[in-house]
Each structure stands twice: as structure tokens, then as C-alpha cells.
Design a protein with these regions (language model features):
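Short alpha-helical donor nucleotide-sugar binding micro-motif in glycosyltransferases
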Residues: 93, 264-265, 272-277, 370
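A conserved mid-protein helix/loop that constitutes part of the nucleotide-sugar donor-binding site
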Residues: 199, 203-224, 241-247
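Nucleotide-activated donor-binding/catalytic signature segment of Leloir-type glycosyltransferases, i.e.
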Residues: 247-265
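A short, well-ordered alpha-helix in the C-terminal region of glycosyltransferases
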Residues: 258, 339, 346-360, 372
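Aromatic "clamp/platform" in nucleotide-sugar-dependent glycosyltransferases that forms part
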Residues: 285
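Short glycine/serine-rich donor-binding loops of glycosyltransferases
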Residues: 290-293, 311
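Short hydrophobic beta-strand element within catalytic cores of glycosyltransferases
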Residues: 302-305, 315
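Conserved acidic donor-binding segment of nucleotide-sugar-dependent glycosyltransferases
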Residues: 317-330, 339-345
Length: 392
């Protein structure tokens, strides 16, 4: 049985021709591909980059033209090249039994339309915040509407999160993760450590506007201006379109000595870095269920996170596995940083609770949940780690 994945994810090849990508995408595609006999992955291509993770070795990779520009310019570019996109997608989707669409995204949305038109079994996962907030665009509102309308039958619709009540009728919650069972068995945090002499803060993720990093810079600067000592050191792990602007902002704000940009790291490098950190800070303006929260907790790091998406369910009570702050509120973030970094806290207990919480959030469990939902909704068989297609 063949799976086709339609994504706008940027990927690259090394000198040997192996395909790589960043973040949790290649790991999740590996987990998903393991459920099928064959997999086709449709992606966009960039120049060779650092810190990548290999796509499934036996996957067929089909390169889509990279949309040019941003905002409306990008939308017009996609519309102009729609015949090329649709032609390529139609050829690959026609030969597949199941199509996986990671939303939000313009190219995946086109792929979803082709899959519906060809009456294919469809798995759609919305990776952003399912709640409607002031960060929602007309495009993301349309995508959520389309998922609600199409949910059921051949269309397995998944929203990123956890909960007992479905996100919408005929839809399901699905957590997200980049953690493997092997990684959890390998990573052994020092649960007994408190704060470092110079507190080590870390942000993990894409350096993009929705992550709210300028607010974190402002909170850090406010701590310095108030004479807080010792001044914490902030490490930003990740790449993204805002990196140059953030480096400039840090310099203008006089934070260059306190902020480090590592760029994209592979999983091993990420783990090595996280084991030296004290607290993760994720000041996102919008989020579904962040893989960064789980990565941090796997390394015994409590998380200071904006109260968005599933943060309240993941963080728990104040001080349980971290702390919540109002999104975009510099004063609230500064206050919480001061409180966490200056108050006597049961660090050992907090770190142990973080690690224990994420034990079940593995890619193996993620793939099993998707397989179980497929069998329940489509009446398919699932044995020996593979889905068995039963034509309906």
C-alpha cells in the first residue's frame, strides 16, 4: 500500500544524494512511512543546510517548485503555478491509496483538494493552534472550516492537541512529538541539579514572528535594567526567517553578550545542549502543541510558555512542569522570569515531573495512534506494524 505526503517543507540533498529536512518533519514522516509498504514525499528544495535529519531512505522524493515571495505575493505565485503543482500532485496521488496532508500550508491545501477529487483516503493533520485567536488568518480559518466540513468517511481529520472532547464532530486530537523511545532511553538528565551559577535559558524552535522572541528580548533587557543578578544567558536553538532581524535587535538592545544563536541542530546536538540548560522559555503568540515543550521536558527542563493552545494541559498547574504567561505581555514574562530564577524551588521534583510526563509522547506512540484511528474509521487491519488496505 502506498502513502503520498504533500508538504511545502524545505528539504535538501547531501553529496551522496540523501534527502534531509529540519525539525520534527523527517522524524514524523519516518514514523508514518513505517505503516505503509511504499511512500512518496512531495517537498520543496533548498540549498544544502546544517543540522538536518534524513528522510526515509526508501521514500520516493518528488520536488515541487518553491513558491516565491511572502504573503499575498506568495499566494499569487502559487496561483500562477497552480497547473504545474496540480499536475505533479495528480500523478503521484493517483497512484497512492492514502494521502497525508500536514496543514497549514498552501501546497498541502492544493494536495488535499486533489486527494478529495480523486476520492483517496485522506489523513489531514492541522499542526497549528486549533483555537481561533487574533493570529488566525483568513487562509487558516478556511483550512479549519474545510477540515470540519470534510471530516468523516474516507477523510481522517486530526487537530494537534490532547483532550477528551473532540475538536469538532468526526475529528480527533493527535499529539505531536519528535521524541523516539530510543532517545528517551538514552537521555539521562541530572534531576538533582538546581540552577546554574549563571542561569541558562533556552528557546527551541523556528525563528519566526509567531514565536514572540522580541518580547523575550524586552523582558530580558528589563531584568538587566532592574539590576537583576546574575543576568541569565539565553540560547536560541533553531533557524528561520527572523534570524537576521533578531541578531540585529539583540545588538541594538545591548543583549549580544547574553544571547546566543546556535542555528539548526541535529537531534544529538540538541540533546547535548539541552542537558546543560536550566529552563526553557517559549513565548509564542500562537501554538498548538509544541514539540519544543516536550523536547525540553524530556531533558528535565520546566517550561515558561505563553498560555496558548495546549500549553495549559502540558504545563499543568503553576510550578508543576513549568509556568504560564500571557502571550505578548513583556511585564508578565519579566515578572515570571524573575520569580523562577530567584525563588527557592524544588527543582529535583519539578525536573522529575517533566520527564515522567513525556514518557508516553513518543513517535512510536504517535504512529500507533494514527494507525488505530485508521482502523477505527476505515475498518482496516493493523498487524506487524503495517496498515492493511481493505478496499471500500
Amino acid at each position: 500500500m502506498r502513502l503520498c505526503v504533500v508538504s511545502f517543507k524545505e528539504c535538501w540533498t547531501d553529496s551522496t544524494g540523501h534527502w534531509y529536512s529540519s525539525g520534527g518533519f523527517p522524524l514524523q514522516i519516518k514514523a508514518l512511512a513505517s505503516l505503509f509498504d511504499q511512500t512518496t514525499v512531495m517537498i520543496t528544495r533548498i540549498k544544502e543546510s546544517d543540522g538536518g535529519i534524513e528522510l526515509p531512505e526508501n521514500a520516493k522524493v518528488v520536488v515541487l517548485p518553491s513558491p516565491q515571495g511572502e504573503g499575498m505575493e506568495r499566494k499569487l505565485n502559487v496561483l500562477t503555478h497552480a497547473p504545474i503543482y496540480l499536475s505533479k500532485m495528480w500523478r503521484e496521488i493517483r497512484e497512492s491509496q492514502v494521502v497525508y496532508i500536514p496543514l497549514p500550508g498552501d501546497l498541502p491545501l492544493l494536495g488535499m483538494g486533489v486527494a478529495v477529487g480523486l476520492r483517496k483516503h485522506l489523513i489531514v493533520r492541522y499542526g497549528g493552534s486549533w483555537e481561533v485567536n487574533d493570529q488566525a488568518t483568513l487562509a487558516t480559518r478556511f483550512m479549519r472550516w474545510a477540515m470540519r466540513v470534510l471530516a468523516g468517511g474516507r477523510n481522517l481529520m486530526l487537530a494537534t492537541g490532547i483532550g477528551d472532547t473532540p475538536p469538532s464532530p468526526n475529528m480527533h486530537w493527535l499529539f505531536t512529538t519528535a521524541l523516539t523511545r530510543e532517545e528517551l532511553e538514552t537521555v539521562m538528565p541530572n534531576f538533582e541539579r538546581g540552577l546554574s551559577a549563571v542561569p541558562q535559558l533556552v528557546f527551541i524552535g523556528r525563528l519566526s514572528p509567531e514565536k514572540g522572541l522580541p518580547f523575550l528580548f524586552e523582558a530580558l533587557k528589563a531584568l538587566i535594567e532592574e539590576g537583576f543578578h546574575p543576568v541569565p544567558h539565553l540560547t536560541l536553538i533553531g533557524e528561520g526567517p527572523q534570524r537576521n532581524a533578531l541578531e540585529t535587535l539583540a545588538r541594538i538592545m545591548g543583549l549580544s553578550d547574553y544571547v546566543e544563536f546556535t542555528g539548526q541542530l541535529d537531534r544529538r546536538e540538541l540533546s547535548t545542549r539541552l542537558l546543560t540548560m536550566d529552563v526553557a522559555v517559549q513565548p509564542s503568540l500562537t501554538e498548538g502543541l509544541s514539540k519544543a515543550w516536550l523536547d525540553a521536558m524530556a531533558h528535565g527542563l520546566p517550561v515558561i510558555a505563553s498560555d496558548v493552545g495546549m500549553a495549559r494541559k502540558i504545563i499543568g498547574r503553576d510550578g508543576e512542569r513549568g509556568w504560564l504567561v500571557r502571550p505578548g505581555d513583556v511585564s508578565n514574562l519579566k515578572f515570571k522570569l524573575r520569580e523562577v530564577l530567584s525563588s527557592p524551588l524544588p527543582w529535583s521534583q519539578v525536573r522529575k515531573r517533566c520527564r515522567q510526563f513525556v514518557e508516553g509522547f513518543t513517535l512510536e506512540a504517535w504512529g500507533d495512534q494514527i494507525a488505530r484511528l485508521c482502523t477505527e474509521q476505515w475498518g482496516w487491519a493493523y498487524s506487524n506494524g503495517r496498515l492493511q488496505w481493505m478496499k471500500s
